[in-house]
Amino acid sequence: MRSLFTRFFQLEAASGLLLIAAAVLALIINNSPLSYLYSGLLDVPVAVQIGALNIAKPLLLWINDGLMALFFLLIGLEVKREVVDGHLSKPSQVILPATAAVGGMVVPALIYWFINRDNPAAVAGWAIPTATDIAFALGVLALLGKRVPVSLKLFLMTLAIIDDLGAIIVIALFYSGTLSSVSLLLAAACLVVLIAMNRLGVVKLGPYMVIGLILWVCVLKSGVHATLAGVALALCIPLRTRNAETSPLLALEHALHPWVAYAILPLFAFANAGVSLAGMTVESFTHPVPMGIAVGLLLGKTVGVFGLTWLAVKLRLAALPAGAGWGQILGVAILCGIGFTMSLFVGSLAFSPGSSEYAGMDRMGILTGSFFAAVIGYAVTAMASRKPRVG
């Protein structure tokens, strides 16, 4: 299990650095004479037709609805593995990161709502600052190397996974469109088939992938966000088999992880982080939408994660990660304010590009809040991790 975690952490760290590069590249291109190529590429229509079935979307939505379904498939696999046979399998190991994750979602949402409470249209973005980008946050923490204890990295990873689970629930409950009963029934039928395959001991991944693709199409047409099909599929992939040497879930997780870390997430960041800075003023950054997001990420995450961690420890519900101090917990709490890809994704649901006046503003708030959370979080964690000099 430790070697699995080490591989996961190293992969997430490298992915975080690649995400930064992708976002910076998008910002540079979209604020240069080549900006027309950037917007033109994302608006390229892509259509798939099989008989009477026709799915036509611009490239941006194929990335957000299609490729990100694979990202959520990976999240679902990680959550199932952790719950069945990992750090979420024992209640004593879950209490502290789960409590911190709840605080890290509730406080930013309340801050955003308070700042935008007089604008019903803007309030729709309340969930944007509740997200944490696990790849980016772990990537920043990785820069400190062995100065931070492994237990602190495990705490951040577990917290972020629970945070992702919360984001999945939020998307399902609050960001679904008009529902189609026929498509939902077909999606339910696909789920029944997947569950039956699991119970009957089917271990080949091929059949799961075929039914999963059909499930994705049904969910896409149902009005529920298509990425949730990835989560549903993940929960049906068997972790254990009669032959203890094989695990379909681990095999799929290992196969997906490099693609998600090095291709899908950087591509998503490139497609969604290209904010045009033309005509921006100080007032643009102090608008309630970007202000609510940035303050929610930077201040809300810090107060929520650190505050509820402190409360859980003081009430003796849980203990601090072994070898970690309060200064390091504060640093990690600030790092949780790196919303980036997850916040961009929720923002694309709350304020659809091209159909909402806040579509660009939310990205300004996300990038600003995430940047300062990364810089300040790194500095605080580094200072708290200094070893006293001898002599």
Swiss-Prot record:
GO MF: sodium:proton antiporter activity
Record's keyword annotation contains Nuclease: no
Annotated membrane topology: Multi-pass membrane protein
Entry's transmembrane regions: 9-29, 36-56, 59-79, 95-115, 123-143, 154-174, 177-197, 213-235, 259-279, 293-313, 329-349, 364-384
Pfam families, per the entry: Na_H_antiport_1
Localization of this protein: Cell inner membrane
UniProt keyword Transport present: yes
Superkingdom of source: Bacteria
Keywords: Antiport, Cell inner membrane, Cell membrane, Ion transport, Membrane, Sodium, Sodium transport, Transmembrane, Transmembrane helix, Transport
InterPro entries registered for this protein in UniProt: Na/H_antiporter_dom_sf (IPR023171), NhaA (IPR004670)
Designated name of the protein: Na(+)/H(+) antiporter NhaA
Source organism per UniProt: Pseudomonas putida (strain GB-1)
